[in-house]
Amino acid sequence: YVMGHFRWDKF
């Protein structure tokens, strides 16, 4: 996780 899982990290 980087920020949380809004866009890129959600994959």
UniProtKB/Swiss-Prot annotation:
This is Melanotropin gamma. Keywords: Amidation, Hormone, Secreted. The modification Phenylalanine amide is found at residue 11. One of its GO terms (molecular function) is hormone activity. Belongs to the POMC family. GO terms for cellular component: extracellular region. It is found in: Secreted. Its main location: secreted.
